Amino acid sequence: MNDFEPTNRKPKIRNATKTLRVWPGNDWQESEPEELGFDRAKLTEAGRYQANIAGDQPYRILIVRHGKIAAEWNFRTDPASQADQASASKSTFSSILGIAIREGVIKSENDRVSDYYPEMLDVAQGEGPKDGRYAFPENDSITFRQLIGNTSGYMKPGEAPGKVFNYQTFGMNILTHAIASAYNLYKTSNPKQGAGFGTLTEWKIRNLIGGTWSWKYGNFEMHAKAKLGVFGYMTSYQMTPRDMARMGWLWLNRGNWNGDQIIPAEWMDKATKVSSEILENEPPERHIYGLGFWCNDQAQVWPDLPKDSFAASGAGNQHIWACP
């Protein structure tokens, strides 16, 4: 909005302590900020701050509370267009892992990934993404938990599984391929032939919560011998702000959508807290990541914000921040 005011402008109710949560249908309900417990003046101040730091750069911000839109800003961009979620997609990967474990397709987060996707070990020296990156014997013990928590050390000689927090893409690709393979949806010999992990997400989450997002595979430019079918083909979701809000609302409600437990609640509780691997092996300032989510329970990511807050974040300033 050009005046940087919240979408809704007429104050109604100041006390929102008894406001009930609702779920969107085809679209979201909108409400006055005060009705949802927001201070209109502070929202306006936040909008002006965003405008000042953005300058001429486009941006979109959507604020939801109790299942209703409280404020929205769109500057030089179409609010209905889709944006690549980049690494913010990893939080959705985590959600599907939790579902796959509940369904018994993956027996445990602590299972060895190579038991489901042995191809991950078939990357010799000279076949990885660059010099020094290849699958080595210790990678055979990597677990699903280590992959989603970015502590796997996959194709990182010298990094023992579960010991080093190293934010990476290729380990996440192994995660999605292993899960999709367990559902018989991915083949390294022809990655684009199978339905893929993105379609699995549509079946297990998107269609159940009324989302509209699409997905695509992405690859970095690599040398000719790189085994992209094994460790490439990243699943990336293309979402509108309202799609992002649906995912955030699902996560904030511990995986529940209007009474349907889409993602196991116990998985969401676990995934949105800093992992034990990071707590045990990294210094306090790196106590920032759970199982596919940026987590604040150790007050390291956002020291001045509530400890129960967490986020999906990706390149291009793609963020879904939730505060239960």
Predicted regions and their residues:
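Active-site helix/loop module of the DD-peptidase/beta-lactamase fold
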Residues: D84, E103-Y154, N184-M234, E266
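Flexible glycine/proline-enriched surface loops and loop-helix/loop-strand junctions
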Residues: D78-A80, P157-P161, M172-N173, A180, ...
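Solvent-exposed loop and edge beta-strand segments that line ligand/cofactor-binding
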Residues: A83-D84, F136, E159-Y167, V230-Q238, ...
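N-terminal leader/targeting segments and the immediately adjacent pre-domain N-terminus
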Residues: M1-D78, A83, I101-K107, G149
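Flexible, glycine-rich surface segments
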Residues: K216-I278
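Active-site Gly/Thr loop motif
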Residues: G218-A226, K273-C323
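Active-site SXXK
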Residues: G67, A83-E109, L175-I179, M244-M247, ...
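Active-site-proximal alpha-helical segments within enzyme catalytic domains
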Residues: N150, G171-A178, T235-N256, Q318-P324
